[in-house]
Design a protein with these regions (language model features):
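Membrane-interface extramembranous regions
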Residues: 1-118
Length: 118
């Protein structure tokens, strides 16, 4: 049971960060706008996107190499702490913060279960 939940969490996390990261790397208009709102250059947002895509790959590879998955998820969690901090600095409401909060909860759940695998 735990393994199937871990696989499901890894898949959800990987898809979310692959899509978000690719959007930042491609500098789609909504990401350019958000970068400007939080005071980041588009280049900085692209680098964050690279980290997100790498983290997504690391979480998936963590299904075969558990310590890698834990490290990747921990790195993504640090990115999310930064994202939540950016939301708070902008005085965003719950609606704007919900995606970041949901992904943070997924990462915490993944880490909780994955620690038992290493």
């Amino acid at each position: 049971m735990t393994t199937s939940i871990l696989v499901s969490l890894a898949a959800l996390i990987a898809v979310a960060f692959a899509v978000l990261g690719a959007s930042k790397i491609r500098a789609v208009p909504s990401m350019q706008t958000r970068a400007a709102q939080v005071g980041f250059s588009v280049g900085a947002y692209k680098r964050i996107g690279v980290l997100e895509v790498a983290g997504a790959a690391g979480v998936l590879l963590g299904l075969a190499i558990p310590p890698l998955g834990v490290l990747a998820a921990a790195g993504l969690l640090l990115l999310m702490v930064g994202a939540l901090g950016a939301h708070l600095r902008q005085h965003d409401g719950v609606a704007e913060m919900t995606p970041a909060l949901v992904v943070t909860v997924l990462l915490v759940a993944y880490l909780w279960l994955a620690f038992g695998k290493i």
